[in-house]
Protein backbone atom coordinates (compact mmCIF):
# COMPACT_ATOMS: atom_id res chain seq x y z
CA UNK A 1 0.00 0.00 0.00
CA UNK A 2 1.29 3.46 -0.80
CA UNK A 3 0.44 6.38 1.44
CA UNK A 4 0.52 10.00 0.29
CA UNK A 5 -0.02 12.64 2.97
CA UNK A 6 -2.39 15.47 2.13
CA UNK A 7 -1.62 19.20 2.14
CA UNK A 8 1.15 20.17 4.62
CA UNK A 9 1.44 16.78 6.31
CA UNK A 10 4.60 14.68 6.42
CA UNK A 11 5.06 10.92 6.99
CA UNK A 12 8.10 10.17 9.19
CA UNK A 13 9.89 6.95 10.23
CA UNK A 14 11.47 7.24 13.68
CA UNK A 15 15.21 6.59 13.92
CA UNK A 16 15.91 3.89 16.51
CA UNK A 17 17.17 5.13 19.89
CA UNK A 18 20.61 4.22 21.16
CA UNK A 19 20.83 0.94 23.07
CA UNK A 20 23.39 2.29 25.56
CA UNK A 21 24.59 5.58 26.98
CA UNK A 22 27.91 7.27 26.22
CA UNK A 23 29.20 5.76 29.49
CA UNK A 24 28.32 2.23 28.32
CA UNK A 25 25.17 1.68 30.40
CA UNK A 26 22.62 -0.43 28.54
CA UNK A 27 19.16 1.15 28.51
CA UNK A 28 16.26 -1.31 28.93
CA UNK A 29 13.28 -0.97 26.56
CA UNK A 30 11.03 0.15 29.42
CA UNK A 31 13.29 3.16 30.15
CA UNK A 32 13.87 4.29 26.56
CA UNK A 33 12.23 7.48 25.40
CA UNK A 34 10.79 7.60 21.92
CA UNK A 35 13.29 9.31 19.65
CA UNK A 36 12.44 12.78 18.38
CA UNK A 37 14.43 12.19 15.21
CA UNK A 38 13.34 10.53 12.01
CA UNK A 39 13.54 10.13 8.26
CA UNK A 40 10.87 11.68 6.04
CA UNK A 41 9.12 8.94 4.06
CA UNK A 42 6.59 11.03 2.10
CA UNK A 43 5.33 14.62 1.95
CA UNK A 44 2.06 16.24 0.94
CA UNK A 45 1.64 18.68 -1.93
CA UNK A 46 1.91 21.76 0.31
CA UNK A 47 -0.03 24.18 2.47
CA UNK A 48 -3.10 25.71 0.84
CA UNK A 49 -3.65 29.43 1.48
CA UNK A 50 -7.12 30.98 1.77
CA UNK A 51 -6.86 32.29 -1.80
CA UNK A 52 -6.19 28.74 -3.07
CA UNK A 53 -2.47 29.00 -3.80
CA UNK A 54 -0.31 26.08 -2.68
CA UNK A 55 3.01 26.69 -0.92
CA UNK A 56 5.37 23.70 -1.37
CA UNK A 57 6.92 22.13 1.74
CA UNK A 58 10.53 22.76 2.78
CA UNK A 59 11.18 19.11 3.67
CA UNK A 60 11.42 16.28 1.15
CA UNK A 61 11.59 12.48 1.22
CA UNK A 62 14.76 11.07 2.86
CA UNK A 63 15.45 14.25 4.89
CA UNK A 64 16.60 13.51 8.46
CA UNK A 65 14.49 15.71 10.76
CA UNK A 66 14.02 16.63 14.42
CA UNK A 67 10.52 17.03 15.82
CA UNK A 68 8.88 17.70 19.17
CA UNK A 69 8.55 14.87 21.67
CA UNK A 70 4.74 14.83 21.43
CA UNK A 71 4.48 15.68 17.71
CA UNK A 72 2.45 13.73 15.24
CA UNK A 73 0.01 10.85 15.24
CA UNK A 74 1.21 7.26 15.20
CA UNK A 75 -0.06 5.25 12.23
CA UNK A 76 0.68 1.77 10.90
CA UNK A 77 1.39 1.52 7.16
CA UNK A 78 2.25 -1.92 5.72
CA UNK A 79 2.90 -3.20 9.26
CA UNK A 80 5.42 -0.43 9.98
CA UNK A 81 4.90 2.11 12.77
CA UNK A 82 5.20 5.63 11.34
CA UNK A 83 4.27 9.16 12.38
CA UNK A 84 2.18 11.62 10.43
CA UNK A 85 2.59 15.28 11.38
CA UNK A 86 2.24 18.77 10.00
CA UNK A 87 5.39 20.33 8.61
CA UNK A 88 5.16 22.99 11.33
CA UNK A 89 5.75 20.22 13.95
CA UNK A 90 9.21 19.64 12.45
CA UNK A 91 11.89 21.66 14.23
CA UNK A 92 14.57 21.34 11.56
CA UNK A 93 16.47 19.24 9.05
CA UNK A 94 19.75 17.56 10.09
CA UNK A 95 22.67 17.71 7.69
Swiss-Prot record:
GO BP terms, alphabetized: chaperone cofactor-dependent protein refolding
Q: Which GO terms describe its cellular component?
A: cytoplasm
Q: Which domain of life is it from?
A: Bacteria
Q: Please explain the role this protein plays, according to its UniProt record.
A: Together with the chaperonin GroEL, plays an essential role in assisting protein folding. The GroEL-GroES system forms a nano-cage that allows encapsulation of the non-native substrate proteins and provides a physical environment optimized to promote and accelerate protein folding. GroES binds to the apical surface of the GroEL ring, thereby capping the opening of the GroEL channel.
Location in or out of the cell: Cytoplasm
Q: Name one Pfam family in it.
A: Cpn10
Q: Which GO terms describe its molecular function?
A: ATP binding; metal ion binding; protein folding chaperone; protein-folding chaperone binding; unfolded protein binding
PROSITE patterns assigned to the protein according to its UniProt record, in alphabetical order: CHAPERONINS_CPN10 (PS00681)
The primary site where this protein sits is: cytoplasm
What is the protein's given name?
Co-chaperonin GroES
Residue pairs linked by disulfide bridges in the UniProt entry: none
Subunit organization: Heptamer of 7 subunits arranged in a ring. Interacts with the chaperonin GroEL.
Give the record's keywords alphabetically.
Chaperone, Cytoplasm
The record's similarity note reads: Belongs to the GroES chaperonin family.
* InterPro entries cross-referenced by the UniProt entry: Chaperonin_GroES, Chaperonin_GroES_sf, Chaprnonin_Cpn10_CS, GroES-like_sf
Q: Which residues form a coiled coil?
A: none
> Per its UniProt record, what HAMAP family does this chain match?
CH10
